[in-house]
């Protein structure tokens, strides 16, 4: 497997990617939290960033979103080198982040949350009719037909609240949408709802960065896959270069599972029985070797 990522243009596109990082890294004091990360995000594509806890996903998000600055490598937005001082600067460049703990006020109506901090005024008063009408239309464009945008947003399902946040970011000019674990706290049905919204955002020409630890959610919607482990790049693939099973295997840590299986087997008794079960699961996942290793 080739773990050194290479940046390639998608299809025949000649325009600069919306976002490009080359050999980017971040230090926290003496701790190297992120090292050698290269990725690109183009309009109309979903780039999935996968990794377990502590892989470096949050650090990567914070660099792209303007919360932290990178210490190594380069970061470009539409071909322009950048080093943001704040999330507002990133937002001004069209980079919006939807975090797992959504920035919504549960008791406020849907339309108030949609325009929160960006209220439209007609003279000295808020233009309530415009904001209600716009909220309903924008949500409908994303596939949610709310009967009443005056209902508290807390009454919506988790997937629907994610949709409101995504739709809000699109309406206010996002070109790149960073989604931080949007399906982590959702059930199967609501996860499917969010994945459909991700596809719709891609079809509207946005570049989407989908942060997740779940390859089964990433693979159906992703065009590129960046795998991180302990701050380093484990692999960077386009969709035609890796299967879902291989992606799952890399996430599951095939080599580590095989090593554990051998350790258990040498212990005999119940440990050996557990090793046989684990070995069967490893084979079923098709892990233990990297894509292209054969």
What do these predicted regions represent?
Residues 2-294:
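Glycine-rich phosphate-binding loops of nucleotide-dependent enzymes
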């Amino acid at each position: 497997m080739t773990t050194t990522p290479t940046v390639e243009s998608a299809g025949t596109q000649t325009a600069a990617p919306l976002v490009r990082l080359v050999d980017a890294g971040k230090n926290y004091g003496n701790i190297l939290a992120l090292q050698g990360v290269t990725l690109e995000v183009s309009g109309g594509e979903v780039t999935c960033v996968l990794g377990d806890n502590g892989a470096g996903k949050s650090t990567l998000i914070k660099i792209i979103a303007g919360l932290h600055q990178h210490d190594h490598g380069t970061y470009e937005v539409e071909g322009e080198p950048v080093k943001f001082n704040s999330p507002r600067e990133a937002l001004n460049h069209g980079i919006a982040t939807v975090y797992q703990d959504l920035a919504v006020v549960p008791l406020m109506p849907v339309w108030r949350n949609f325009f929160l901090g960006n209220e439209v005024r007609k003279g000295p008063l808020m233009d309530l009719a415009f904001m209600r009408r716009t909220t309903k239309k924008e949500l409908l464009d994303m596939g949610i037909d709310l009967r009443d945008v005056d209902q508290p947003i807390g009454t919506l399902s988790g997937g629907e609240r994610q949709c409101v946040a995504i739709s809000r970011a699109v309406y206010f000019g996002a070109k790149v949408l960073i989604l931080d674990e949007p399906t982590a706290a959702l059930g199967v049905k609501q996860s499917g709802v969010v994945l459909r919204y991700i596809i719709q955002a891609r079809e509207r020409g946005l570049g989407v960065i989908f942060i997740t630890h779940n390859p089964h959610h990433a693979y159906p919607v992703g065009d590129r896959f960046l795998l991180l482990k302990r701050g380093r790049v484990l692999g960077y693939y386009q969709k035609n270069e890796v299967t879902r099973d291989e992606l799952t295997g890399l996430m599951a840590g095939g080599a580590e599972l095989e090593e554990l299986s051998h350790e258990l087997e040498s212990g005999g008794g119940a440990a050996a029985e557990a090793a046989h079960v684990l070995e069967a699961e490893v084979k079923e996942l098709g892990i233990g070797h990297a894509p292209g290793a054969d």
